[in-house]
Amino acid sequence: MEIKAAIVRQKNGPFLLEHVALNEPAEDQVLVRLVATGLCHTDLVCRDQHYPVPLPMVFGHEGAGVVERVGSAVKKVQPGDHVVLTFYTCGSCDACLSGDPTSCANSFGPNFMGRSVTGECTIHDHQGAEVGASFFGQSSFATYALSYERNTVKVTKDVPLELLGPLGCGIQTGAGSVLNALNPPAGSAIAIFGAGAVGLSAVMAAVVAGCTTIIAVDVKENRLELASELGATHIINPAANDPIEAIKEIFADGVPYVLETSGLPAVLTQAILSSAIGGEIGIVGAPPMGATVPVDINFLLFNRKLRGIVEGQSISDIFIPRLVELYRQGKFPFDKLIKFYPFDEINRAAEDSEKGVTLKPVLRIG
């Protein structure tokens, strides 16, 4: 079928809106008409080849839409369902079978390499040339996408569907890093480095978790103001104050839970050094490939736990509907992070995101 998609054809290149041909759904696939799609930092990192994915490619991995058709083996959703599209996992490796799909051993290819699970190219341009697709099992910078049963999450119809796409990645990552991975007990303290969409989602999740001290660290005052509005009890601007010293003025021994969302190695070092003995430091920010940080191993030896977190360690079929319900109850107001753009202004949305003008751009598609 003919669809419209935003294609990146060269490193650092623009998103080009083109009419392309999309395959019919295979037996395990779902054809989704996109209503809106979030634009995520990972889309831009891959566009610019900091992660070397093949080009040309249709990116987009925070899709929300309506099921149009399903393959013969699909049972979880049916035409007319409202869905959020998230990351692909195989469902058959040890990690998936153990209930930890974010550690899937077979997820890299289907999420990043531009082909379906069976190795097919699912999008061709008007000249018949292959265009990479199936990005995160969806490629949702398009009017329609092919997803899989495993990365298609059914959601309620009584919440605006155009809001929900970012729950598939960025917001799920921030909230899940707190609620699923770090899991701080009520009454505890957490420091969150970086107050972008992921970091502010973590702030809101810390409120849900019952943390009584929530420290947000960022160099942009407008983001810190929003962090306070969303529940941060303390804000620190590293441009004005050393964040390690500022945190230790609040907690002399450091904080028990720390989350680093910026992807900047120097900030990760600050996050580690802000932690208490026995503390846990989660890393979700995506630095350039090969980035390293200098850390005194003896500092970590004192029962500190340094861990990477993928997609908030979420089981999306469970976690995304929970976030939707928290939003419905007014306990997780992630809509305050979102700014909408028409699909044909995708390049402006990307520029605004890179400049920090917009926290979470969402493209209205159909």
From Swiss-Prot:
Zn(2+) 1 binds at residues 40, 61, 169. One of its GO terms (cellular component) is cytosol. Homodimer. CDD domains: benzyl_alcohol_DH. Belongs to the zinc-containing alcohol dehydrogenase family. Oxidizes primary alcohols with an aromatic or cyclohex-1-ene ring. It is highly specific for benzyl alcohol. GO terms for molecular function: aryl-alcohol dehydrogenase (NAD+) activity; S-(hydroxymethyl)glutathione dehydrogenase [NAD(P)+] activity; zinc ion binding. Gene3D superfamilies: Medium-chain alcohol dehydrogenases, catalytic domain, NAD(P)-binding Rossmann-like Domain. PROSITE patterns: ADH_ZINC. The keyword NAD applies. The gene is xylB. Its EC number is 1.1.1.90. It comes from Pseudomonas putida. GO terms for biological process: formaldehyde catabolic process. It catalyses: an aromatic primary alcohol + NAD(+) = an aromatic aldehyde + NADH + H(+). Binds 2 Zn(2+) ions per subunit. Keywords: Aromatic hydrocarbons catabolism, Metal-binding, NAD, Oxidoreductase, Plasmid, Zinc. This is Aryl-alcohol dehydrogenase. Zn(2+) 2 binds at residues 90, 93, 96, 104. It is an enzyme of class 1 (oxidoreductase). Its cofactor is Zn(2+).
